[in-house]
Amino acid sequence: NQIWLAENLKYKCSGSYSYKDNKSNDENYGRLYTYYALAKACPKGWHVPSDAEWKELAYYAKEHKDSNGTGTSLKANHSCWECDNNTPLGTNQFGFSAWAAGYKDSLTFYFDQGYGAYFWSTTEDSDDSDRACVWSLKYDKEALFSNFESKFCATSVRCIKD
C-alpha cells in the first residue's frame, strides 16, 4: 500500500549536489542530498521514508519478486549499472527504477556512480546522533542493504506518498 516516486529527486536546494559537480548528471541520476537537506527535499504530499517504510518495501519485494534477488528487482534495467557475466542486470520488476547514482562522502569526494544506489531514510542511529540509516543497492549484489552513515554524506532521495 505504499506509493514511491519512481525516480531520484532532482530538486536543487541547499545541501544538495550534482555528482562530481556535473549538472548534466542531475537529469538521469538526480541530485545527492545531505541528511540536513531532507526536510525541504520532497514535494508537498510526499516525505522521505523512515527505516520502517524501507523495511516494508524490502519485505514486499522479497515476497513478490521473481527468481532474481530483492535488490535486482528494484534496480533499473539500464546501462547505468555496471555489469559483468556474473552480475544480473536489474529487472525493475516493481517500477522502482533505481539508478546507480553513487554518493558523496562527508568531505568532498564522490564514489560509486555506476556501481551503487544509496538512499536516505529519516531514521537516526540511536547510538550516534550524527548518523542516519541509508539503504543501498550494489551492482554486484542481488540484495537491498542498510547501514548508518554520517549525516554529512550526500545520497539519492526517494520520496513516499503521505
Task: List each language-model region with its residue ranges.
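Conserved positions within compact, well-structured domain cores
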Residues: 2-162
